């Protein structure tokens, strides 16, 4: 899964000590600091991260930490293919589909509008990636994508034959939003141009793929470090619908609060 790192010291102890010290220094943003990135993009980034990577110990891995990267298994595709939403498709027992229409099914919905992700009798999520129930914003984003899929099913005829077309359309939309909106907001313009014009990425038909001859893979440095910048984007409170100044405890809800509070 991960590329091999050339023989060299894995860690520089001095650098690690400096990083550890930085984590304990109190910081305060400037009084006039105003981010230009809307709050919801933090959680769209979390959704993307879940869609790209999910690591697990292989059967050969000992229980002790740290785990050698060669003994980790990647359970998701890094190709932005919405497996975290669709799972293995209509036959996936973890994802409740209406097999007659190819639509997602949920406990709380008005027509195609799904108000909460599907749950079992104990409130546990019934979705392809349970990590998308970590907070109410991410959970609602997952539910919104389910709703869009259901609307696309109607657009393509309203039967299970429409499922692959709706899935393809939503995946394409998702990839275009990542390229033309999300990453344009996060990356320097030169970096964005290099990534999409001068790299190993290309559009194969309509989908973003690694160029032929290149394997789609993610480095351990990206998964374990570079991608984690999103944690610093979390805000101390959020406004959600008519609720204002919800702290992080409220955003990291239990399912029992959702139907009456949001």
Where are these regions (language model features)?
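Mobile, glycine-rich extracellular loop/lid and propeptide segments
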Residues: 141-144, 152
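Surface-exposed intrinsically disordered loops and tails
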Residues: 102-121
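Inter-helical turn/loop segments and adjacent helix faces that build the functional surface
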Residues: 152-163
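Acidic/His metal-coordination segments adjacent to aromatic residues that form catalytic metal sites
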Residues: 118-135
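Carbohydrate-associated surface elements
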Residues: 1-87, 91-97, 107-111
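Extended amphipathic alpha-helical segments with heptad-repeat/coiled-coil character used for oligomerization
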Residues: 167-253
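Conserved small/polar residues in nucleotide/adenosyl-binding loops
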Residues: 254-260
């Amino acid at each position: 899964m991960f590329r091999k790192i050339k023989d060299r010291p894995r860690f520089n102890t001095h650098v690690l000590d400096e990083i550890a010290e930085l984590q304990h220094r109190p910081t305060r943003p400037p009084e006039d600091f105003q981010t230009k990135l809307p709050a919801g993009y933090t959680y769209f980034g979390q959704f993307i991260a879940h869609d790209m990577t999910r690591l697990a110990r292989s059967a050969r891995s000992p229980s002790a930490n740290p785990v050698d990267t060669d003994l980790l298994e990647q359970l998701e595709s890094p190709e932005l293919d919405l497996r975290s939403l669709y799972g293995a498709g209509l036959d996936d027992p973890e994802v409740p589909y209406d097999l007659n229409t190819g639509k997602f099914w949920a406990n709380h919905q008005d027509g195609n509008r799904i108000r909460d992700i599907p749950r079992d009798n104990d409130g546990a999520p019934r979705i392809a990636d349970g990590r998308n129930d970590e907070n109410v914003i991410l959970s609602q984003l997952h539910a919104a994508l389910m709703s869009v899929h259901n609307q696309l099913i109607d657009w393509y005829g309203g039967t299970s034959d429409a499922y692959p077309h709706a899935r393809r359309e939503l995946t394409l939309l998702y990839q275009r939003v990542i390229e033309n909106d999300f990453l344009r907001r996060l990356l320097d313009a030169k970096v964005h141009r290099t990534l999409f014009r001068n790299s190993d990425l290309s559009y194969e038909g309509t989908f973003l793929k690694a160029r032929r001859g290149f394997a789609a893979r993610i480095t351990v440095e990206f998964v374990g470090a570079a991608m984690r910048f999103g944690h610093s984007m979390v805000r101390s409170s959020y406004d959600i619908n008519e609720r204002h100044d919800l702290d992080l405890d409220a955003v990291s809800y239990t399912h029992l609060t959702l139907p009456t509070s949001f």
